[in-house]
Amino acid sequence: MIVDDSAIVRQVMQAILNKDPGIEVISAVADPIFAMNRMAIQWPDVIVLDIEMPRMDGVTFLRKIMAERPTPVVICSTLTDKGAETTMQALSAGAVSIVTKPKIGLKDFIQDAASDITNAVKAAAKANMSNIRAPKAAVKVREKNGVESLIPCGASAMSKTTEHVVAIGTSTGGTQALEFLLKALPTNAPGIVVVQHMPEKFTASFAERLDSICDIRVSEARHNDRVLPGHALIAPGGKHMMLKRSGAQYLVEIIDGPLVNRHKPSVDVLFRSTAKCAGKNAVGFILTGMGDDGARGLKDMLDAGAPTIAQDEKSCVVFGMPKEAIALGAAGKILPLAQIPQEIMRYAHLKD
């Protein structure tokens, strides 16, 4: 089902999805009220949902769906700061992935992004909705303008050099998995670098949201940011992130370049660079997601002496990326999501 107040979007998206023999669009409606009437007759397997619509917004509709009958939802959002912020609310409420659209040139854009849209719907159709977690804990508000923020970056960084790096890669279902994982970590966690498949603009909002609810710091990575204990760096959408070493410091390098495994940022790019410059001083985790991005990079990490862990099938929203890594022999361990925070801290204490 397509729910979008733009007739052009509905028309073009319906034509694109119906071209795939594995997809049937049962309806394309202008707003959530029409959608609910239609769903009373026939419930869809996947919903492609706009955010900003008349009569009822997409996030409100999404919450109603998740309360009544959890269903895979792909958010179709405009590439704006406001759209990114609202989309983060939708992902937190249970949406599984994002497809972006511009404010102008919609028809041409959707045609160009046909494969991305089709792949997003197919990935959503495989989602295990029992593993989509709505936030259970209240948002923790943490003061960020105190003494810590007044210490010059260089001084605090040099005194808090991380010797260990945790590299994490994830895609579909990863926003919920990362929220669960990072919220569980204490402030003495090792430095963390993350690739979450997500479009540009959205990663900044995602990092800000995580930072507001986690004890550790979370931010969108910038070129030459240091990897520090108690801090997670999220790769910016539309760029690759690589780990590099400068003396005793680990830094991240943010670069442009071609898509790798159809993605930018790519998990393989992060994992391979981590294997090269951190070796056995790193640990790699591949979490829920569609496709095979990260499998070969995780194998490189394992071959370089790093512990490597894949999320198990039962706890994944989509068991794609971990499955490929396991099949390649890249995973030294297979663990449920609930045990991964403890595994990160166990690794940190073993290395101390």
UniProtKB/Swiss-Prot annotation:
GO annotation terms (biological process): chemotaxis
Listed Gene3D superfamilies: 3.40.50.2300, Methylesterase CheB, C-terminal domain
4-aspartylphosphate PTM sites in chain numbering: 50
Domain of life from the UniProt record: Bacteria
Swiss-Prot/TrEMBL keywords: Chemotaxis, Cytoplasm, Hydrolase, Phosphoprotein
Keyword Cytoplasm: yes
A Gene Ontology cellular-component term: cytoplasm
GO MF annotation: an example: protein-glutamine glutaminase activity
Annotated ranges, domain CheB-type methylesterase: 159-351
PTM info: Phosphorylated by CheA. Phosphorylation of the N-terminal regulatory domain activates the methylesterase activity.
Active site feature: 171, 197, 293
UniProt-listed Pfam families: CheB_methylest, Response_reg
Enzyme Commission number(s): 3.1.1.61, 3.5.1.44
Localization terms from the record: Cytoplasm
Database matches in SMART domains: REC (SM00448)
Catalytic activity: [protein]-L-glutamate 5-O-methyl ester + H2O = L-glutamyl-[protein] + methanol + H(+); L-glutaminyl-[protein] + H2O = L-glutamyl-[protein] + NH4(+)
Domain Response regulatory: 1-116
NCBIfam families cross-referenced by the UniProt entry: PRK00742.1, PRK12555.1
Biological function: Involved in chemotaxis. Part of a chemotaxis signal transduction system that modulates chemotaxis in response to various stimuli. Catalyzes the demethylation of specific methylglutamate residues introduced into the chemoreceptors (methyl-accepting chemotaxis proteins or MCP) by CheR. Also mediates the irreversible deamidation of specific glutamine residues to glutamic acid.
Domain writeup: Contains a C-terminal catalytic domain, and an N-terminal region which modulates catalytic activity.
Similarity section: Belongs to the CheB family.
Name of the featured protein: Protein-glutamate methylesterase/protein-glutamine glutaminase 2
